[in-house]
């Protein structure tokens, strides 16, 4: 595979692929994140037949993105990529409503991928009133490494796209990361990370330490986030479809399932 060193190369490949009609895709470029991947020698590309692949290398697996001419071409060209690149564990996210996503899932299943988990988007119209929440603070840069440590320890990297330390610091800098602190020095009982635009609030990560669950920490963090997004029109997040406790909590706040799903699939290439 070819190393991607600058964002401009990614842009060029996307334009070329679109012009060639490679419109079957799970690749939605994010300049801010991908500039970092290029800088860290973690982003690669390879053209196989009628599919342009992009690969993000991580310590124990690789995330695969594609732009292909058809579902059939994707399955065929994936076999070529896997054969050429030896051993490894590959993760693919397939995002969309069922009518768009299901043919892709069927194609990837036919070439050896298996489903790890399914996430579904929930949303609600932003309420007119937002409750304030006591004990919740904006995170500081001194919290960044501890938050990264908690994410690495309690989230599943293959399924939940754990952010880098640099991304965490960015959210802290724009005041999109709230924490509740524990009694011990430098301890954090919970945090919530979110993206905010004039139109929408998007929950990215919500965590409550196992030792304090059931004590209202999670609810106060959510209320603080909702208050921060009180001028938006809609509020969204993704939830694992088997996480019944979280779904029950979100429905309590008026969220309902939307058609968009993210099916995470894995492929282990062992030669």
Show which residues each predicted segment covers.
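A conserved beta-strand-loop-helix scaffold within acyl/acetyltransferase catalytic domains
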Residues: 56-60, 163-184, 188-208
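Acyl-donor-binding surface of acyltransferase catalytic domains
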Residues: 68-133, 263-269
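Conserved acetyl-CoA-binding loop-helix of GNAT-fold acetyltransferases
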Residues: 71-84, 208, 214-227, 248, ...
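Conserved hydrophobic beta-strand within the GNAT/NAT acetyltransferase core sheet
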Residues: 92-93, 203, 236-241
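Conserved active-site alpha-helix within GNAT-family acetyltransferase domains
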Residues: 98-115, 219, 242-260
């Amino acid at each position: 595979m070819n190393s991607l060193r600058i964002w401009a190369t990614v842009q060029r490949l996307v334009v070329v692929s679109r012009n060639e009609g490679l419109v079957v895709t799970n690749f939605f470029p994010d300049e801010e994140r991908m500039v970092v991947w290029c800088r860290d020698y973690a982003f690669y590309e390879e053209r196989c037949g009628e599919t342009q692949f992009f690969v993000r290398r991580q310590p124990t697996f690789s995330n695969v993105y594609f732009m292909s001419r058809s579902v059939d071409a994707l399955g065929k060209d994936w076999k070529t990529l896997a054969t050429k690149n030896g051993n490894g564990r590959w993760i693919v996210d397939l995002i969309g409503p069922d009518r768009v996503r299901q043919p892709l899932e069927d194609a990837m299943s036919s070439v050896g991928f298996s489903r790890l988990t399914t996430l579904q988007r929930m949303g609600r119209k932003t309420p007119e009133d937002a409750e304030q929440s006591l004990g919740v603070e904006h995170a500081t840069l001194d919290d960044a490494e501890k938050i990264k440590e908690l994410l690495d320890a309690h989230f599943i990297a293959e399924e939940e796209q754990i952010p880098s330390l640099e991304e965490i610091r960015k959210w802290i800098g724009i005041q999109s990361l709230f924490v509740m602190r524990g009694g011990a020095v430098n301890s954090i009982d919970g945090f919530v990370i979110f993206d905010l635009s004039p139109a929408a609030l998007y929950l990215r990560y919500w965590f409550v330490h196992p030792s304090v669950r059931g004590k209202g920490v999670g609810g106060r963090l959510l209320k603080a986030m909702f208050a921060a997004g009180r001028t938006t029109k809609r509020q969204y997040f993704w939830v694992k479809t088997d996480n019944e406790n979280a779904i029950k909590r979100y429905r309590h706040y008026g969220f309902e399932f939307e058609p968009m799903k993210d099916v995470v699939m894995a492929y282990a290439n062992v030669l």
